[in-house]
């Protein structure tokens, strides 16, 4: 359930908190800071806003509406689960707020601590020769595509 809730936070609708996969900051459209600016992210095609506060060095972030996130993620939550998720998400937001205060300007970017970044494997496509065994194990197969049952209802 926590993973689904986190995914819902990432891809929730506007006016909710977002965790950007490419940055370590939590970004929000609803916060109590004095200045906001909005930035359109074309690859993800959803709005992300950064919030800055001139009063303090960290932004005050509002927790998301968990009931709406559950509806967006198409999961059903009881009121007790909603309350539990709200407290967990609030703790995560507070934790990321602490991370925003860390100065990382002097830290060199690295893939891993023990690697220098030059010994990664080449990203080359590979052909799988035993396609017939895969086709035999799949119940519904049409041309080059797998047929799977519909799992989401369009409402």
Swiss-Prot record:
One of its GO terms (biological process) is mitochondrial translation. It is found in: Mitochondrion; Plastid, Chloroplast. GO terms for molecular function: ATP binding; glutaminyl-tRNA synthase (glutamine-hydrolyzing) activity. Keywords: ATP-binding, Chloroplast, Ligase, Mitochondrion, Nucleotide-binding, Plastid, Protein biosynthesis, Transit peptide. Residues 1-52 form a transit peptide. It catalyses: L-glutamyl-tRNA(Gln) + L-glutamine + ATP + H2O = L-glutaminyl-tRNA(Gln) + L-glutamate + ADP + phosphate + H(+). Its main location: mitochondrion. SUPFAM superfamilies: Glu-tRNAGln amidotransferase C subunit. Allows the formation of correctly charged Gln-tRNA(Gln) through the transamidation of misacylated Glu-tRNA(Gln) in chloroplasts and mitochondria. The reaction takes place in the presence of glutamine and ATP through an activated gamma-phospho-Glu-tRNA(Gln). Subunit of the heterotrimeric GatCAB amidotransferase (AdT) complex, composed of A, B and C subunits. Belongs to the GatC family. NCBIfam families: gatC. This is Glutamyl-tRNA(Gln) amidotransferase subunit C, chloroplastic/mitochondrial. It comes from Arabidopsis thaliana (Mouse-ear cress). The gene is GATC.
């Amino acid at each position: 359930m926590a993973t689904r809730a986190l995914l819902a936070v990432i891809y929730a609708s506007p006016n909710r908190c977002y965790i950007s996969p490419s940055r370590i900051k939590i970004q929000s459209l609803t916060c109590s800071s004095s200045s906001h600016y909005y930035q359109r992210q074309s690859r993800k095609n959803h709005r992300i806003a950064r919030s800055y506060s001139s009063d303090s060095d960290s932004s005050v972030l509002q927790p998301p509406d968990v009931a709406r996130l559950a509806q967006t993620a198409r999961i059903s939550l009881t009121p007790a689960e909603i309350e539990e998720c709200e407290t967990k998400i609030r703790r995560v937001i507070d934790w990321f707020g602490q991370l925003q205060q860390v100065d990382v300007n002097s830290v060199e970017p690295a893939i891993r601590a023990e690697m220098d970044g030059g010994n990664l494997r080449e990203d080359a496509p590979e052909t799988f020769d035993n396609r017939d065994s895969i086709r035999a194990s799949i119940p519904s197969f049409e041309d080059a595509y797998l047929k799977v049952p519909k799992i989401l209802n369009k409402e």
